């Protein structure tokens, strides 16, 4: 994406959880969903109760759709997604 002088790229923070929860090690419904996000060149901060990544406003819908397709096609029963603007630092 090419920005003109003075334009700012809006970044969004996407937090997500994928069920069922598997004790000990995440199942393929989680690992494949994370892999789907990372195929877009985005790093996922993986946590035990939820994970997150940052994406541009333009790329977020495609990344989330790919993540959800991967999760459900590998056995997810519920996916929760929350999206917020990244706070200015």
Whereabouts are the PLM-identified features?
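Charge-rich, low-complexity N-terminal segments
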Residues: 2-89
């Amino acid at each position: 994406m090419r920005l003109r002088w003075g334009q700012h790229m809006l970044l969004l923070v996407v937090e997500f959880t994928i069920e069922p929860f598997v004790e000990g090690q995440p199942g393929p419904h989680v690992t494949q969903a994370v892999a789907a996000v990372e195929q877009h060149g985005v790093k996922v901060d993986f946590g035990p109760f939820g994970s997150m990544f940052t994406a541009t406003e333009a790329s977020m819908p495609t990344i989330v759709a790919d993540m959800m397709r991967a999760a459900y096609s590998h056995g997810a029963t519920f996916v929760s997604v929350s999206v917020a603007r990244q706070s200015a630092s």
